[in-house]
Amino acid sequence: MELVLGLKYIAVALLIGFGAIGTAVGFGNMGGKFLEACARQPELAPSLQVKMFILAGLIDAVAMIGVGIAMVLLFVL
């Protein structure tokens, strides 16, 4: 029984950790591409900024959903 609990804790930690790493990589890539696009075509910066913020919210939502799933695994199952 202790082995199952230990493995469950490791699974939850990996789920939250990899979700955070993936979110950070996604934000970094998106920010870099946004800056490149604004440097190439400055007149498109306002519309690109709106799209970037929408995508940032979606990327962040993926990490929050991962934390929610991890909490269900930790406390319910």
From Swiss-Prot:
Record keywords, A-Z: ATP synthesis, Cell inner membrane, Cell membrane, CF(0), Hydrogen ion transport, Ion transport, Lipid-binding, Membrane, Transmembrane, Transmembrane helix, Transport
Site feature Reversibly protonated during proton transport, where: 60
Domain of life per record: Bacteria
TM helices/strands, residue ranges: 10-30, 57-77
Protein localization: Cell inner membrane
Pfam families: ATP-synt_C
InterPro entries (UniProt xref): ATP_synth_csu_bac/chlpt, ATP_synth_F0_csu, ATP_synth_F0_csu_DDCD_BS, ATP_synth_F0_csu_sf, ATPase_proteolipid_c-like_dom, F/V-ATP_Csub_sf
Function text: F(1)F(0) ATP synthase produces ATP from ADP in the presence of a proton or sodium gradient. F-type ATPases consist of two structural domains, F(1) containing the extramembraneous catalytic core and F(0) containing the membrane proton channel, linked together by a central stalk and a peripheral stalk. During catalysis, ATP synthesis in the catalytic domain of F(1) is coupled via a rotary mechanism of the central stalk subunits to proton translocation.
Family: Belongs to the ATPase C chain family.
Protein name as it appears in the record: ATP synthase subunit c
Organism: Pseudoalteromonas translucida (strain TAC 125)
Lineage of origin: Bacteria, Pseudomonadati, Pseudomonadota, Gammaproteobacteria, Alteromonadales
Name of the gene: atpE
